[in-house]
Amino acid sequence: MSKAGASLATCYGPVSTHVMTKAENIRLLILDVDGVLSDGLIYMGNNGEELKAFNVRDGYGIRCALTSNIEVAIITGRKAKLVEDRCATLGIVHLYQGQSNKLIAFSDLLEKLAIAPENVAYVGDDLIDWPVMEKVGLSVAVADAHPLLIPRADYVTHIAGGRGAVREVCDLLLLAQGKLDEAKGQSI
């Protein structure tokens, strides 16, 4: 879903021309992990190991974004080795874990990559994400985000976190930039 106004039909449903215009300029996609790349559930094993499920469609979308010159970064409040491993598998080199104040990592990324805030999209699911979301060019909430986050976002995915929402956002960015048909990734 998107805010009111003229819209463009996509395979995910209508997207406002305002959102598509913002998406044209995105050079960096920042993602939260729990509730965005995963469904927000954490499975704890008897020996203290932590397990999460990641969607391969999201992985494919991330690989397509990366091969289409859109940087991808992770800023997450929790810290887990399996997130490091997933990032390594996908080719994500900008990983910030254990971030209770996500603005610090956001500022570091802008400086490191020499990117303006209006060229950044951020995908979040909860209120901890809003301080960064309100500063970027395109703020995205997943379909099952916290109810207070949804009306604030520029775009709300049709798909829930951990179920392909990130792929939806990647496809949206690539479509807006005229790169969707040429995008090549690999299923991971």
Swiss-Prot record:
Substrate binds at D34, N55, V56, R57, D58, G59, R63, R78, R86, K102. It catalyses: 3-deoxy-alpha-D-manno-2-octulosonate-8-phosphate + H2O = 3-deoxy-alpha-D-manno-oct-2-ulosonate + phosphate. Homotetramer. One of its GO terms (molecular function) is N-acylneuraminate cytidylyltransferase activity. InterPro entries: CMP-NeuNAc_synthase (IPR050793), HAD-like_sf (IPR036412), HAD_sf (IPR023214), KdsC_fam (IPR010023). Mg(2+) binds at D32, D34, D125. This is 3-deoxy-D-manno-octulosonate 8-phosphate phosphatase KdsC. Keywords: Hydrolase, Lipopolysaccharide biosynthesis, Magnesium, Metal-binding. It holds the Pfam family Hydrolase_3.
